[in-house]
Structures are given as C-alpha cells and as structure tokens.
C-alpha cells in the first residue's frame, strides 16, 4: 500500500498536466509510478562490527551497506567505514573480540581511523536517501536484530529513513534447518571473516540459496498446478 502511494504521488505530478502533455504525460506518469514501486521493494543490507553486544557500553567500530532489489541483485554499494573509538574501549573488549578483531586487522584500523560516529551516520543516511524512498525499505542482514539495536541508539536518523520491519536471514536459516534439513546441508558455509562488507555479501548469497533451492520448489509447484488446471479447462463454446 505504501509503495502504491509513492507511485501514485509521482503519477499525479505528471498526470495532472495531462491537458498540456497528452498521452506522453500519462506514459511518463505510469513509468514514474512503476519506478516508485520498484524502489519501494529494495532492501537495505547492513552489517556492523561492534566492540561487543552490550548496548549500554559497547560501540560500533565498522559498518557497511549494500542495496539490493527484491530479487537480491546488488544495485548499489554504499560506504564501508571504520569508526574511531577510544583505546580504553578497545582494551576492555572481550577475549573473543580482541582475538577476531585483532586477527582481521580491524582493531588496528579503528585506532588509525578519524571517522566519527556522527560522520558515519551522515554518510550512510546520504547514501540510502539517494537509493530508497523514505520509510518503505527494510533493514536486512544476518542476525540483523542485534545490529538494529545499536543503529536505533547510535544512528537514529538513519533508522528513521527505513521501514520498521526487518529481513533477518538468520530466521530463514533456522526455519530451513528445521523444515528442509536435507536441502539445508548444501547451504553456503560462512568464511567468518568478521568484516562488515564480507558478512553482508555472504548473507545475500545465503538468502539467494534459500530462495533458489527451497522457496523455489513451492513456487514451481504452484506454477505447475496453475498450468495443469489451465490445460484441463476446456473453452466454453
């Protein structure tokens, strides 16, 4: 409904001058409406690396963002920023974070970064404003509910631009693991680099796998039934 409203607003803007532009105005309006509806179907893929999962004390140290269409084709690659945090916070990270962020080179990169949290939010907000209409496109990612908590707190303007719903690949993963265990065995394995852009790319590939190998079965079955029913129906003379 929201996507249609966006397209309708675009259509009214062009179609309202119908007397001046005639059929061309209607055609342009239809194209604008279709474009608006298409943009409303986009997904905003985000991954964060944090100093931990405690929302009260931990902070974002890396963020990346990609935009896909509803078919999971990547349309735009956004910023991939490393955010400056005080050494005291890095020194107080858990052993797990120290090991993995140290091994990936992220800890060193955070110490060398000059990008503030406010600057990062501005960059990401500018990017999603160019790529998506306000309030219509959901946040997507793996266990993205955890990222959302930090974004709600530290990047509220960025989150305000997105739809309130999320697309969490980890939910799909857990359902497929329970309902289609034989297919799930072939799901792509994660490299676990614990870097933001790599993690997003892996999440998109994982959801593509579920769509092509699990959701597709039901879609093909439905198409087959429609075709069979259509072929069985005889035209009325």
Curated annotation (Swiss-Prot):
GO BP, one annotated term: nucleobase-containing compound metabolic process
Coarse class of the protein's main subcellular location: mitochondrion
Required cofactor(s): Mn(2+); Mg(2+)
Entry EC no(s): 3.1.15.-
Compartment(s) where it occurs, according to its Swiss-Prot or TrEMBL record: Mitochondrion intermembrane space; Mitochondrion matrix; Mitochondrion; Cytoplasm
Residues with the Phosphotyrosine modification: 122
Ranges for domain Exonuclease: 43-207
Annotated site residues (Important for dinucleotide binding) in this chain: 53, 96, 164
Domain of life: Eukaryota
Transit peptide endpoints, chain numbering: 1-25
Residues that coordinate or bind Mg(2+) 1: 47, 49, 199
Matching Pfam families: RNase_T (PF00929)
GO MF entries: 3'-5' exonuclease activity; 3'-5'-DNA exonuclease activity; 3'-5'-RNA exonuclease activity; magnesium ion binding; nucleic acid binding
Alphabetized UniProt keyword annotations: Acetylation, Cytoplasm, Exonuclease, Hydrolase, Magnesium, Manganese, Metal-binding, Mitochondrion, Nuclease, Nucleus, Phosphoprotein, Transit peptide
GO CC entries: cytoplasm; mitochondrial intermembrane space; mitochondrial matrix; mitochondrion; nucleus
Active site, UniProt feature: 194
Positions contributing to Mg(2+) 2 binding: 47, 147
Modified residues (N6-acetyllysine): 173
Function description: 3'-to-5'exoribonuclease that preferentially degrades DNA and RNA oligonucleotides composed of only two nucleotides. Binds and degrades longer oligonucleotides with a lower affinity. Plays dual roles in mitochondria, scavenging nanoRNAs (small RNA oligonucleotides of <5 nucleotides) that are produced by the degradosome and clearing short RNAs that are generated by RNA processing. Essential for correct initiation of mitochondrial transcription, degrading mitochondrial RNA dinucleotides to prevent RNA-primed transcription at non-canonical sites in the mitochondrial genome.
Family named by the database record: Belongs to the oligoribonuclease family.
Quaternary structure and partners: Homodimer. Homotetramer.
Protein name: Oligoribonuclease, mitochondrial
Organism: Rattus norvegicus (Rat)
């Amino acid at each position: 409904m929201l996507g249609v409203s966006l397209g309708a607003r675009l259509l009214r803007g062009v179609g309202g001058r119908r007397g001046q532009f005639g059929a061309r105005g209607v055609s342009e309006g239809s194209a604008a409406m279709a474009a608006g509806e298409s943009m409303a179907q986009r997904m905003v893929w985000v991954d964060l690396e944090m100093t931990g999962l405690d929302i009260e004390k931990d902070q974002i140290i890396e963020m990346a963002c990609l935009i896909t269409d509803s078919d999971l084709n990547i349309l735009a690659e956004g910023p991939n920023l490393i955010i400056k945090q005080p050494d005291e916070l890095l020194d107080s990270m858990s052993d797990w974070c120290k090991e993995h962020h140290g091994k990936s080179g992220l800890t060193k990169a955070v110490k060398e970064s000059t990008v503030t949290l406010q600057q990062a939010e501005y960059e990401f907000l500018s990017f999603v404003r160019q790529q998506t209409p306000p309030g219509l496109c959901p946040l997507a990612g793996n266990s993205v509910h955890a990222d959302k908590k930090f974004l709600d707190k530290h990047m509220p303007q960025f989150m305000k631009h997105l739809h309130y719903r999320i697309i969490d690949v980890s939910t799909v993963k857990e359902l497929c693991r329970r309902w289609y265990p034989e297919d799930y065995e072939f799901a792509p394995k994660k490299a676990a680099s614990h870097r933001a852009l790599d993690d997003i790319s892996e999440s998109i590939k994982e959801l593509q796998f579920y769509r092509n190998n699990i959701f597709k079965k039901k879609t093909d079955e439905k198409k087959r039934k429609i075709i069979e029913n259509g072929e069985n129906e005889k035209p009325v003379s």
